């Protein structure tokens, strides 16, 4: 009896394995195996593409007259998924399968590849061949399969190799060393041509959609021979940044340029997935943020605090979001906040609901708490936070330090080989700025602490590290900010304790981005430091109720 059961169990396991293998083969998608071209260009997983398409109204799938554009095509996944939905939605309009599919690919779906390579990949995905007009040449293998391949419709649906998926043909326009469209540098630090201008490089990443001052005319020439045609729906996943190869070491965001260019084309609908960093920060994104949060045409916004939920193999600081822009309908935006714990919080509000707030606050509860605190009318703690590199300290080397403090000499607090420590500087060390903070009490706080997390990622999050008292005659290295001037040591110690409260760190977390600036501390109130404040004192002072307190306590971690 036992042998029989074992045999049946073995047979069942075998059948299950076979079924799983068969299911994998049937549902296998080659696009899921393609890695990203680089950090700037992140391929869109099929599932994410489908979720973005789900934000569009149902009527778009049964309208044969709409023209769709992906201005930043990387692998054809958007056009393919759109084509599949249109093929189903247009069955009543055109029952003949071949005529229906020909109409969809010929008359409705268009894209511009980001590079030569991605254009070919996209055509291979959508047309089954990198040449849209390639016909079957009659050569087959022993099993009857075409050796050299051929395009959909046997290459007869298009007259050109590109079809409606165009290869970019633009270059950067450099004026005084910078591209006038995307801002990238013409030359590297060594004075030689950079990666975006080097004639020896095959790709210069001059993305066509954002490298033309009259994009409407350019698009009409490229796709419609100059005819006055327009696109009804624009959708895509633009490249996120261009690495700064010149004097700076950071990367310049460019996804905002794609969004703004798409809006200029005035489509009926527009949907894109981009980093969420624009909510509260990002290099050169202040004007973009102001326009976005005041735009009442953004009707749906999905915000992922953890980017890996959309892009498993990619780390994107601050998360990612996708949104729907609706030209003909203004109103409140439906916001879906996808937290790390799998919880999705929903709200419906104008993105600039609180006119005193100049950023997009991710969740409604944080906005509610901030409103209560702002009603008390306190000044901003950011008013006593220094700019970056408060004392103008450059590169430090051992020759600048001495073992013992010299008369009238100064000390420097920073992160050295042994971690945080204070060292004595040689007499005559020049402080180039922030002299008003040298001979007073102050507090030092790190300007960068990505590991401390953000509100909602993780839960709970630390937000900032431990602040340190800065004594009279002590400055700090460029990796710290200074808070002051303060009257005495007691006041400085009270500031350190205030900055350690969950109340303070929650308000900092609302604005926190990768790098901390004085602006990061804008929402924390500037209170009296004649006394030592604890969280309970602050909750009472600002009239926070039980729900407010529970929310803060849940999301902010105790400091060690």
Where would I find each of the regions flagged by the language model?
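SAM-dependent methyltransferase catalytic region
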Residues: 1-301, 306-310, 319, 323-332
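C-terminal substrate-recognition regions of SAM-dependent nucleic acid methyltransferases
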Residues: 35, 39, 47, 229, ...
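A structural signal for short hydrophobic/aromatic patches embedded in well-ordered alpha helices
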Residues: 52, 122, 495, 552-553
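A short structural micro-motif
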Residues: 128-129, 502, 558-559
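Charged, elongated alpha-helical/coil segments that serve as electrostatic interaction surfaces
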Residues: 191, 534, 555-558
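Short, amphipathic C-terminal "tail helix"
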Residues: 547, 552-560
């Amino acid at each position: 009896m036992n042998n029989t059961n074992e045999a049946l169990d073995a047979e069942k396991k075998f059948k299950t394995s076979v079924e799983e293998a068969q299911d994998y083969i049937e549902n296998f998608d080659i696009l899921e195996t393609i890695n990203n071209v680089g950090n700037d260009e992140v391929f869109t997983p099929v599932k994410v593409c489908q979720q973005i398409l789900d934000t569009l109204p149902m009527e778009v799938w049964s309208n044969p007259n709409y023209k769709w554009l992906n201005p930043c095509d990387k692998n054809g996944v958007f056009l393919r998924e759109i084509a599949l939905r249109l093929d189903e939605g247009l069955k009543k309009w055109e029952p003949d399968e071949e005529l229906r599919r020909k109409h969809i690919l010929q008359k409705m779906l268009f894209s511009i590849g980001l590079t030569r390579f991605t254009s070919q990949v996209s055509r291979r995905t959508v047309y089954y061949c990198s040449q849209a007009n390639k016909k079957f040449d009659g050569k087959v293998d022993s099993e009857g399969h075409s050796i050299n391949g051929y395009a959909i419709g046997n290459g007869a649906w298009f007259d050109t190799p590109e079809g409606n998926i165009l290869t970019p043909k633009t270059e950067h326009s450099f004026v005084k060393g910078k591209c006038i469209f995307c801002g990238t540098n013409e030359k590297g630090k060594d004075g030689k041509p950079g990666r975006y201008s080097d004639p020896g490089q095959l790709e210069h990443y001059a993305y066509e959609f954002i490298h033309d001052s009259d994009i409407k005319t350019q698009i009409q020439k490229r796709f419609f021979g100059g005819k006055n045609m327009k696109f009804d729906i624009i959708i895509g996943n633009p490249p996120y940044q261009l690495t700064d190869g010149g004097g700076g070491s950071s990367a310049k965001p460019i996804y905002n340029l794609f969004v703004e260019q798409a809006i200029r084309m005035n489509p009926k609908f527009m949907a894109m997935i981009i980093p969420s960093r624009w909510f509260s920060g990002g290099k050169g994104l202040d004007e973009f943020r102001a326009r976005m949060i005041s735009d009442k045409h953004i009707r749906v916004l999905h915000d992922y605090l953890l980017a890996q939920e959309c892009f498993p193999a990619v780390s994107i600081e601050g998360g990612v979001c996708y949104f729907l822009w609706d030209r003909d309908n203004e109103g409140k935006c439906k916001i879906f906040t996808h937290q790390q714990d799998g919880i999705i919080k929903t709200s419906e509000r104008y993105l600039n609901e609180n006119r005193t707030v100049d950023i997009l606050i991710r969740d409604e509860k944080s906005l509610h708490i901030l409103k209560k605190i702002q009603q008390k009318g306190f000044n901003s703690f950011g008013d006593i936070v220094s700019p970056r590199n408060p004392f103008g300290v450059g590169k430090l080397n051992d020759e600048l330090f001495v073992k013992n403090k010299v008369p009238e000499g100064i000390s420097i607090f920073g992160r050295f080989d042994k971690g945080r420590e204070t060292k004595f500087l040689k007499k005559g060390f020049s402080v180039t700025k922030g002299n008003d903070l040298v001979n007073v009490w102050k507090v030092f706080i790190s300007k960068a602490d990505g590991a401390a997390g953000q509100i909602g990622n993780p839960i709970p999050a630390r937000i900032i590290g431990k602040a340190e008292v800065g004594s009279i005659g002590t400055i700090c290295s460029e990796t710290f900010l200074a808070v002051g001037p303060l009257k005495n040591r007691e006041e400085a110690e009270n500031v350190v304790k205030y900055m350690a409260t969950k109340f303070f760190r929650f308000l900092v977390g609302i604005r926190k981005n990768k790098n901390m600036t004085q602006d990061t501390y804008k929402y924390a109130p500037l209170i009296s430091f004649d006394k030592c404040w604890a969280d309970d004192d602050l909750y009472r002072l600002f009239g926070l109720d039980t729900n407010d307190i529970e929310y803060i306590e849940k999301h902010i971690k105790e400091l060690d």
